[in-house]
Amino acid sequence: MDSRDTGETDQSKYKGIRRRKWGKWVSEIRVPGTRQRLWLGSFSTAEGAAVAHDVAFYCLHRPSSLDDESFNFPHLLTTSLASNISPKSIQKAASDAGMAVDAGFHGAVSGSGGCEERSSMANMEEEDKLSISVYDYLEDDLV
C-alpha cells in the first residue's frame, strides 16, 4: 500500500529535508552568499537528515543562540563548533552526525521488536549532545 493511499504525506515536519519516492530522506543546504549547495546525504530516517541539516546550518550561519527556530533539534547541538571551517568539512561533519542518528534508530528499532522510530527519538533527546565533533574533520591548517 502506498503512503498516499493511507492519507500520509511525504512532507516532513523537519526543516531542510525531503523524502525521495523510494523512501530515503535527503538533506542539502545552500552556502550563504553563493549559488553552491552542499549535499549532506541520504538517510534512512527523517531525523538523521534533520540532524545533518542542523549541523550544517549552525556551521554556515553561526546563529547567536540555539533557540533559533531554524533548528530541528537544537538540544543535540554543541556550541563549541569551530568557525571558518571549509564547506567540505561542514559537509562531512553533518553527514556523519546524520548517519550516527540513523545508526541509533536502527539499533533501537531492531533491538526492541519493531518499536516506532519516534519513541527512539524521545530516548535520544534524553541523552547528551551528539558525540561527534566538527574538530575531527577540520583541515590541519585550521586547527
UniProtKB/Swiss-Prot annotation:
Gene Ontology CC terms: nucleus
Family the entry assigns: Belongs to the AP2/ERF transcription factor family. ERF subfamily.
One of the GO BP terms on file: ethylene-activated signaling pathway
DNA-binding region: 13-74
Pfam annotation, one family: AP2
Coiled-coil parts of chain: none
CDD domains per the UniProt record, alphabetical: AP2
Described function: Probably acts as a transcriptional activator. Binds to the GCC-box pathogenesis-related promoter element. May be involved in the regulation of gene expression by stress factors and by components of stress signal transduction pathways.
Protein name: Ethylene-responsive transcription factor ERF020
Keywords assigned by UniProt, alphabetized: Activator, DNA-binding, Ethylene signaling pathway, Nucleus, Transcription, Transcription regulation
Annotated InterPro entries: AP2/ERF_dom, AP2/ERF_dom_sf, AP2/ERF_TF_ERF_subfamily, DNA-bd_dom_sf
SMART domains cross-referenced by the UniProt entry: AP2
GO molecular function, one term: DNA-binding transcription factor activity
Source organism of the structure: Arabidopsis thaliana
Localization in the cell: Nucleus
